[in-house]
């Protein structure tokens, strides 16, 4: 699928974002749609992780993906090719999405005959953590090359996330990355966050991640 719809989303300057986010979550609950907000730094492997996730779940769940970028539609095309319904969101220079922009994206995604929608937020460890998108759960990807001290440097990102995927574990032997320390740092920021080491490229750990996500979707739809 080469023709991916592109939507220019605009930031709301009116109602409280938190209020809009709560309203969006309620609407999603009524429609039995689970929205996951996926965040990370650029280059962490979000799109590759999404493709592996789609492959693991597409026979069980109807999946839609909203790809947020300042420009380009490369990621949305890759996701559509993987078998998910996809839309590209251009943020017009904004480094995050808020609830109104997310609502616009869901509307642009079309008929919402989906169980799971993944919002791939703009690659950034600061701004996206500050705005409630209306998602049911927040997830983030930390890649091994970024270092094990990111929870200390970007506390809010780890505080708002329900699950942390530690990606690119296949290169652990080549980087000074201490998995135990990283888990400890994450627990300092958010003791409730689930930590799942993965390699999106080889598929290691994807089954555990898919199991967690499947359970969350089913619980939301119950």
Kindly label every feature range from the protein language model.
Residues 90, 142, 199:
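Residues at the C-termini of beta-strands that transition into short coil/loop
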Residues 69, 167, 199:
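Active-site glycine-centered loops adjacent to acidic/histidine catalytic or metal-binding residues
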Residues 3-26, 31-39, 44, 53-136, ...:
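Nucleotide-state-sensitive switch-loop elements of NTP-binding domains
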Residues 60-61, 112, 164, 192-193, ...:
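Secondary-structure boundary/capping positions in well-ordered alpha/beta enzyme cores
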Residues 171-222:
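Canonical P-loop GTPase G-domain recognition
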Residues 128-135, 144-192:
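Conserved C-terminal guanine-recognition region of P-loop GTPase G domains, centered on the G4
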Residues 49:
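Hydrophobic positions on the alpha1 helix immediately C-terminal to the Walker A/P-loop
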